[in-house]
């Protein structure tokens, strides 16, 4: 059986972040989670080597069926040191890095198909400056040369080490104990095994991999580029499954959102952790942790977490938060928070549910076929029963019974010729 070991113990100092490198997110999901999910497509036998922010990373991956190993950096530093603490269980062992969130299972599968003592990934770069070169003869790796040690011919080699390896079990069991930390950094290097194996005449096959999938994330700039690629993959998947997207390069969809039926997404939309079913989300709208079914949203609307909208129209500049809306219309300029509103109800422009008193939040419940006039304030907690009309400009702070009209306005007072008196002008 294949065993996969994911090396994720490093600090990632080049990220310049208080967050562990592998916990940085692309489209809402951490790098380490992407790698685990792709690995699980190949084998259930997965080990993750951790150290930096051990508790936080462990908490992130606790729901995955993986074995967690804590690397002792004092006794066994380095990539080779990480392997010294992992029991070798598989007939073949695939070594991955925790900062490669774009890897794909189908590409990793190709490593198993090669018959060699070691399979080593290489990337062909247009500009390999700054990288060590991999010398390959007839598909076999002969040596890895650091750029500073390379001769003129070796500097012309476009192949560099991509950092992913497949070892036969016997190779690791034989050569891991031979690893030495007799170097300037006092670390155990995994690449030293490559040198020992080559000297002993064993086979090291090179496999060329896609730079986009295997290039590691080492900085915030790398992270932004990787997220751009991941978001593109997510959008392509949903478009291939029938979702219409207008100017998709302007749309952000995270890894946890899903679409069912015929859906349409306008330009500039942001959709996070949401389920969109047979609905249209129009331009420049934001939907977060919500369920939208048979509804039209936007343009320029915001649907916040814990909201469920069914058969509903939400227009421009309407914000919905933690509300269940069934068959209603809120065309423009409203805030509906902590609300339950039933079918046939019309929400006039400027309607506000006043759900917070400075200490706690309260619910607004509105029944069926309610007409709420413009510029209405609903002071929660409040219940409005079916078939109610609320006049424009009203402030509602009491429950309203079925079939009633509610109106709260100061009487209109008209003072004749006031304008002329105020400004001292004649009529």
Curated annotation (Swiss-Prot):
<dbReference type="InterPro" id="IPR018357">
    <property type="entry name" value="Hexapep_transf_CS"/>
</dbReference>
<feature type="binding site">
    <location>
        <position position="374"/>
    </location>
    <ligand>
        <name>acetyl-CoA</name>
    </ligand>
</feature>
<feature type="active site" description="Proton acceptor">
    <location>
        <position position="332"/>
    </location>
</feature>
<keyword id="KW-0677">Repeat</keyword>
<feature type="binding site">
    <location>
        <position position="409"/>
    </location>
    <ligand>
        <name>acetyl-CoA</name>
    </ligand>
</feature>
<feature type="binding site">
    <location>
        <begin position="355"/>
        <end position="356"/>
    </location>
    <ligand>
        <name>acetyl-CoA</name>
    </ligand>
</feature>
<keyword id="KW-0012">Acyltransferase</keyword>
<keyword id="KW-0460">Magnesium</keyword>
<dbReference type="GO" id="GO:0006048">
    <property type="term" value="P:UDP-N-acetylglucosamine biosynthetic process"/>
</dbReference>
<dbReference type="GO" id="GO:0071555">
    <property type="term" value="P:cell wall organization"/>
</dbReference>
<dbReference type="GO" id="GO:0008360">
    <property type="term" value="P:regulation of cell shape"/>
</dbReference>
<feature type="binding site">
    <location>
        <position position="218"/>
    </location>
    <ligand>
        <name>UDP-N-acetyl-alpha-D-glucosamine</name>
    </ligand>
</feature>
<dbReference type="GO" id="GO:0009245">
    <property type="term" value="P:lipid A biosynthetic process"/>
</dbReference>
<dbReference type="GO" id="GO:0009252">
    <property type="term" value="P:peptidoglycan biosynthetic process"/>
</dbReference>
<feature type="region of interest" description="Pyrophosphorylase">
    <location>
        <begin position="1"/>
        <end position="220"/>
    </location>
</feature>
<dbReference type="GO" id="GO:0000287">
    <property type="term" value="F:magnesium ion binding"/>
</dbReference>
<feature type="binding site">
    <location>
        <position position="99"/>
    </location>
    <ligand>
        <name>Mg(2+)</name>
    </ligand>
</feature>
<protein>
    <recommendedName>
        <fullName>Bifunctional protein GlmU</fullName>
        <ecNumber>2.7.7.23</ecNumber>
        <ecNumber>2.3.1.157</ecNumber>
    </recommendedName>
</protein>
<comment type="pathway">
    <text>Nucleotide-sugar biosynthesis; UDP-N-acetyl-alpha-D-glucosamine biosynthesis; UDP-N-acetyl-alpha-D-glucosamine from N-acetyl-alpha-D-glucosamine 1-phosphate: step 1/1.</text>
</comment>
<feature type="binding site">
    <location>
        <position position="349"/>
    </location>
    <ligand>
        <name>acetyl-CoA</name>
    </ligand>
</feature>
<feature type="binding site">
    <location>
        <position position="132"/>
    </location>
    <ligand>
        <name>UDP-N-acetyl-alpha-D-glucosamine</name>
    </ligand>
</feature>
<keyword id="KW-0961">Cell wall biogenesis/degradation</keyword>
<feature type="binding site">
    <location>
        <begin position="7"/>
        <end position="10"/>
    </location>
    <ligand>
        <name>UDP-N-acetyl-alpha-D-glucosamine</name>
    </ligand>
</feature>
<keyword id="KW-0479">Metal-binding</keyword>
<dbReference type="GO" id="GO:0005737">
    <property type="term" value="C:cytoplasm"/>
</dbReference>
<feature type="binding site">
    <location>
        <position position="146"/>
    </location>
    <ligand>
        <name>UDP-N-acetyl-alpha-D-glucosamine</name>
    </ligand>
</feature>
<keyword id="KW-0963">Cytoplasm</keyword>
<feature type="binding site">
    <location>
        <position position="335"/>
    </location>
    <ligand>
        <name>UDP-N-acetyl-alpha-D-glucosamine</name>
    </ligand>
</feature>
<comment type="function">
    <text>Catalyzes the last two sequential reactions in the de novo biosynthetic pathway for UDP-N-acetylglucosamine (UDP-GlcNAc). The C-terminal domain catalyzes the transfer of acetyl group from acetyl coenzyme A to glucosamine-1-phosphate (GlcN-1-P) to produce N-acetylglucosamine-1-phosphate (GlcNAc-1-P), which is converted into UDP-GlcNAc by the transfer of uridine 5-monophosphate (from uridine 5-triphosphate), a reaction catalyzed by the N-terminal domain.</text>
</comment>
<feature type="binding site">
    <location>
        <begin position="78"/>
        <end position="79"/>
    </location>
    <ligand>
        <name>UDP-N-acetyl-alpha-D-glucosamine</name>
    </ligand>
</feature>
<dbReference type="Pfam" id="PF12804">
    <property type="entry name" value="NTP_transf_3"/>
</dbReference>
<feature type="binding site">
    <location>
        <position position="346"/>
    </location>
    <ligand>
        <name>UDP-N-acetyl-alpha-D-glucosamine</name>
    </ligand>
</feature>
<keyword id="KW-0511">Multifunctional enzyme</keyword>
<dbReference type="GO" id="GO:0016020">
    <property type="term" value="C:membrane"/>
</dbReference>
<feature type="region of interest" description="Linker">
    <location>
        <begin position="221"/>
        <end position="241"/>
    </location>
</feature>
<feature type="binding site">
    <location>
        <position position="218"/>
    </location>
    <ligand>
        <name>Mg(2+)</name>
    </ligand>
</feature>
<dbReference type="InterPro" id="IPR029044">
    <property type="entry name" value="Nucleotide-diphossugar_trans"/>
</dbReference>
<comment type="pathway">
    <text>Nucleotide-sugar biosynthesis; UDP-N-acetyl-alpha-D-glucosamine biosynthesis; N-acetyl-alpha-D-glucosamine 1-phosphate from alpha-D-glucosamine 6-phosphate (route II): step 2/2.</text>
</comment>
<dbReference type="GO" id="GO:0003977">
    <property type="term" value="F:UDP-N-acetylglucosamine diphosphorylase activity"/>
</dbReference>
<comment type="similarity">
    <text>In the N-terminal section; belongs to the N-acetylglucosamine-1-phosphate uridyltransferase family.</text>
</comment>
<dbReference type="InterPro" id="IPR001451">
    <property type="entry name" value="Hexapep"/>
</dbReference>
<dbReference type="InterPro" id="IPR005882">
    <property type="entry name" value="Bifunctional_GlmU"/>
</dbReference>
